A protein has these predicted regions:
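Conserved nucleotide-binding/hydrolysis micro-motifs of P-loop NTPases
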Residues: 42-45, 79-80, 122-123, 154-157, ...
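Conserved P-loop
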Residues: 6-106
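Phosphate-binding/switch loop-helix module in NTP-utilizing enzymes
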Residues: 83-147
Length: 188
C-alpha cells in the first residue's frame, strides 16, 4: 500500500506523549502495510527504551509474517542533547544531525519509506542545531506520497504553518511534580 498524498504532522508542547503519539501512528501504518522509519535524534544507541524492546519483541510475530504488514525501522544517533550532557560538542552534534537528516532525505527520494517520524527534531530546530532553510530542504526532499511526522518541544511557527496536523500537548498534571521518578514501561 502507498499513500496517495502524504501530509505533515507536528506533535509539540511541554506535555508528555509526543513520541508516544507518533509511535501510535507508526503502529497503525505498519499494520496497514506502510513502511515506517523512526529517526530518533538526541537518543543514544546504547540507551535502553521500551519502544526498541517492543520492536524486538515483534520479530517473528504471526500477525507480521506475510500478510499486509509493513516494515518498521528505528534509527538513533549516538549523542545526547547538551541539556543532558554539559560537555557535548555542539558542532559535532550538529554535523551528526545533518548527516542523519541527509540520509533520511536520500532514502525518502529512493522510495524506501511511506511514513517518516523525526523524533525530537523540533528540539533540534528550537536549539539551532538545524536552521529553517535546512528544514525547508528536508520537506522539499520528501516525495508527495510520504507522510512526515515531527516531534519534540518548541516547534517553530514556520513548521506549524506548513503542517497539516498540529497537536500541542500540555501537562495538566504529572507525577514528576510530586517527585515520582520516570517508570520503566510507562515513561521509557
Amino acid at each position: 500500500m502507498k499513500l496517495e498524498k502524504g501530509l505533515i504532522h507536528v506533535y509539540t508542547g511541554e506535555g508528555k506523549g509526543k513520541t508516544s503519539a507518533a509511535l501510535g501512528l507508526a503502529m497503525r501504518a505498519v499494520g496497514r502495510g506502510l513502511n515506517v522509519l523512526v529517526q530518533q535524534y538526541f537518543k543514544l544507541e546504547s540507551e535502553p527504551s521500551g519502544e526498541l524492546a517492543w520492536k524486538e519483541g515483534l520479530k517473528g510475530h504471526p500477525a507480521l509474517e506475510g500478510g499486509e504488514a509493513g516494515h518498521l525501522i528505528f534509527r538513533r544517533g549516538d549523542y545526547r542533547h547538551p541539556f543532558f550532557d554539559k560537555n557535548a560538542d555542539r558542532a559535532a552534534i550538529r554535523a551528526k544531525i545533518l548527516e542523519q537528516t541527509a540520509l533520511v532525505a536520500a532514502e525518502m527520494k529512493a522510495g524506501y519509506w511511506d511514513v517518516v517520524i523525526l523524533d525530537e527534531f523540533n528540539n533540534a530546530l528550537r536549539d539551532k542545531f538545524v536552521d529553517l532553510e535546512e528544514l525547508e530542504a528536508l520537506i522539499d526532499a520528501s516525495p508527495e506520497e510520504v507522510e512526515l511526522v515531527f516531534t519534540g518541544r518548541g516547534a517553530p511557527v514556520e513548521l506549524i504553518e506548513v503542517a497539516d496536523y498540529v497537536t500541542e500537548l500540555h501537562a495538566v498534571k504529572h507525577p514528576g511534580t510530586r517527585k515520582i521518578a520516570a517508570r520503566k514501561g510507562i515513561e521509557f
